[in-house]
C-alpha cells in the first residue's frame, strides 16, 4: 500500500487520478466553466482570504503633527474611507494597519514601536507625509527620527507636506492591491 504525498498548496487534485492539475488543464477548465454557468465562483482559499482581508482593514491612527488633520479629513463624508472597508479602531490590538502621520521624534520612537508590537499579525504600516517618510523639514534636527522606517517596517509611503486626503486614499488602495497581490500567508 503506497502512500501518496500531500498535495502542495494552491494545486487542484483530479479526483479520478489523485494527481495535481495545472491551471490550464482541460479538466480543470471544463469544471470551472460548468460551475461558472451555475453561479459558482471557483477560487483558492488564499485568494478568498486576501479578498476578505482587503475589504475589512482596521486602522489605527498615530497622528503626530499636521498630517493628522488630513488623515482625519479622509474619514469625513467627502472621502469616506470606510466605503472601501477601511474602518478606524481605538486599540492597536484590534488594528491591521497603522498610519504614521507627522514628525517622529526620538522620544516618541519607543512608543511607536510598542504600539506596532501590540498589533496582531499580519500588520501593515502606512507612512504619511514628508516628516514620517524621511524627517521632512526637520530632517537635520537632533531630536527627529529620519523616517519611521528606521523604527517599524513600512509598506506604503504617501508623499507630501501635508499629503492631501486623496493621496492617503490612493495609498490605502495601493495597500489593498499589495495585500491581494502578495497575500498574507507569506508575510
Swiss-Prot record:
[4Fe-4S] cluster binds at residues 66-67, 131, 161. GO terms for molecular function: 4 iron, 4 sulfur cluster binding; iron ion binding; NADH dehydrogenase (ubiquinone) activity; NADH:ubiquinone reductase (non-electrogenic) activity; quinone binding. It is found in: Cell inner membrane. One of its GO terms (biological process) is aerobic respiration. The keyword Plastid does not apply. It catalyses: a quinone + NADH + 5 H(+)(in) = a quinol + NAD(+) + 4 H(+)(out). Its cofactor is [4Fe-4S] cluster. Binds 1 [4Fe-4S] cluster. One of its GO terms (cellular component) is respiratory chain complex I. It is a peripheral membrane protein. Pfam families: Oxidored_q6. Keywords: 4Fe-4S, Cell inner membrane, Cell membrane, Iron, Iron-sulfur, Membrane, Metal-binding, NAD, Quinone, Translocase, Transport, Ubiquinone. InterPro entries: NADH_UbQ_OxRdtase-like_20kDa, NADH_UQ_OxRdtase_20Kd_su. Its EC number is 7.1.1.-. The keyword Cell division does not apply. It is an enzyme of class 7 (translocase). It comes from the Bacteria. NDH-1 shuttles electrons from NADH, via FMN and iron-sulfur (Fe-S) centers, to quinones in the respiratory chain. The immediate electron acceptor for the enzyme in this species is believed to be ubiquinone. Couples the redox reaction to proton translocation (for every two electrons transferred, four hydrogen ions are translocated across the cytoplasmic membrane), and thus conserves the redox energy in a proton gradient. Belongs to the complex I 20 kDa subunit family. NDH-1 is composed of 14 different subunits. Subunits NuoB, C, D, E, F, and G constitute the peripheral sector of the complex. This is NADH-quinone oxidoreductase subunit B.
Amino acid at each position: 500500500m503506497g502512500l501518496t504525498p500531500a498535495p502542495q498548496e494552491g494545486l487542484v487534485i483530479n479526483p479520478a487520478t489523485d494527481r495535481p492539475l495545472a491551471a490550464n488543464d482541460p479538466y480543470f477548465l471544463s469544471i470551472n466553466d460548468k460551475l461558472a454557468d451555475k453561479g459558482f465562483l471557483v477560487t483558492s482559499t488564499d485568494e478568498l482570504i486576501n479578498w476578505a482581508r482587503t475589504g475589512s482593514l482596521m486602522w489605527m491612527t498615530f497622528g503626530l503633527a499636521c498630517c493628522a488633520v488630513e488623515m482625519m479629513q479622509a474619514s469625513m463624508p467627502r472621502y469616506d474611507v470606510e466605503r472601501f472597508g477601511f474602518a478606524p479602531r481605538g486599540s492597536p490590538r484590534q488594528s491591521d494597519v497603522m498610519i504614521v502621520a507627522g514628525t517622529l521624534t526620538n522620544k516618541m520612537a519607543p512608543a511607536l514601536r510598542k504600539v506596532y508590537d501590540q498589533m496582531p499579525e499580519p500588520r501593515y504600516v502606512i507612512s504619511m507625509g514628508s516628516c514620517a517618510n524621511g524627517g521632512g523639514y526637520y530632517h537635520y534636527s537632533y531630536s527627529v527620527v529620519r523616517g519611521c522606517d528606521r523604527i517599524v517596517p513600512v509598506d506604503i509611503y504617501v508623499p507630501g507636506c501635508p499629503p492631501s486626503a486623496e493621496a492617503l486614499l490612493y495609498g490605502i488602495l495601493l495597500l489593498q492591491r499589495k495585500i491581494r497581490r502578495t497575500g498574507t500567508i507569506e508575510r
